[in-house]
Amino acid sequence: MIAEKVLFLVLDGISDRPCEALDGLTPLAAARTPVLDRLAAEGVCGIMDSVAPGIRPGSDTSHLALLGYPPQEFYTGRGPLEAEGTGIHMTAGMIGFRCNFATVDADGLVTDRRAGRISGTEPLAEAIREGVDLSGLGLEFRFEAGAGHRAALALIGEGLGDKVSSNDPKKEGVQPLTIRPGSDDPADAKTARACNEFIRQSREILDGHPVNVRRMEEGLPPGNLLLIRGAGKMGALPQFPERYGLSGSVISAATLISGIGMVVGLEHIPVPGTTGSVDSDLDAKVRAAIGELGRKDFVLMNIKGADEAGHDGKSIQKRDFIEVIDKALAPLLDLKNTLILVCADHSTPCSVKDHSADPVPVVIRGPGVRIDRTNRFDEVSCAEGGLHRIRGRDLMPIILDLINKSHKYGA
């Protein structure tokens, strides 16, 4: 029997390194995961370098690689992908950026790069749209709130470049940086000026906004600064249905992932109650994925909360959320005629509080799969599986072969 459907499940940042608080285990190894372990026992396992050994992948470059779009060939910056995911349609002449709502104190020092993982930022975004004016530079802009502390910006106008730096200092207790051009090209200088002006005007708006006033009264960090980075122009990506002969959907509360999916031709399926954080309604997300498999060949589903716990250095919270994920995945065990692939997009070690180059576990379960002897889904157990060590770009060819849609190489 050959599977006709594919569920591609990315457990964002779930992979880790040994944690002292977990007696030297990773959060995944320490968690009770009967569903993931059953998938491992009924499938073929391995470990995977999302981009290449030793390369620390971003969520953008890793997801491109997982979908069979090697970032070395197709990546043009995270900003335009994030913008697409928030509903900003990127066209020629637009420069896209990813943004964070962050917190600065009275001395202008960054005290929280994610403003306490603020949510409900649409009123802040609306105030920025209404109050910021870049017409003096001959430019327009689009700005949209994303999930949690995230947002996206697109600059629109003539003579813009995408080689500019970021104002994000990547640490707290210091001043935000000034955005600078990355070349002598006047187009890059114009973009840098526009970004700095946008940041200046938006900060004036955010400082006194009622949402932030209320947050400060409640002892919460205000979202009173925008950190802008990831500048880029939208590149041309081959469409997924034509590239693979599969219709598809993407289910993700993270605007970056939904943006990548939409850019390559997957239909974005919004799911009420999903947040991209540890409070997300995972049951609703799984139900939506199962429903989409009834009308599409391929469903990409991203679950993100474990990644946030890794970035925050909270190993116990990460372990506990992995157990929540596992429980929510139980209905997938009953899927028929479906190839289920589960992997991480990258490791987010709690000790690093960022992505690392450590390979991630992967399992493929479904009709026709050669079952190996692995019976646990974790970083060490999967390393002993039949897939051995592969790259992210290898996944789609393996999937196509298992569903009998690959093409013979040679006569």
From Swiss-Prot:
One of its GO terms (molecular function) is phosphoglycerate mutase activity. Residues 164-190 are annotated as: Disordered. It holds the Pfam family Metalloenzyme. Pathway: Carbohydrate degradation; glycolysis; pyruvate from D-glyceraldehyde 3-phosphate: step 3/5. Keywords: Glycolysis, Isomerase. InterPro entries: Alkaline_phosphatase_core_sf, ApgAM_prokaryotes, Metalloenzyme, Pglycerate_mutase_ApgM. It catalyses: (2R)-2-phosphoglycerate = (2R)-3-phosphoglycerate. Catalyzes the interconversion of 2-phosphoglycerate and 3-phosphoglycerate. NCBIfam families: apgM, PRK04024.1. Belongs to the BPG-independent phosphoglycerate mutase family. A-PGAM subfamily. This is 2,3-bisphosphoglycerate-independent phosphoglycerate mutase. It comes from Methanoculleus marisnigri (strain ATCC 35101 / DSM 1498 / JR1). The gene is apgM.
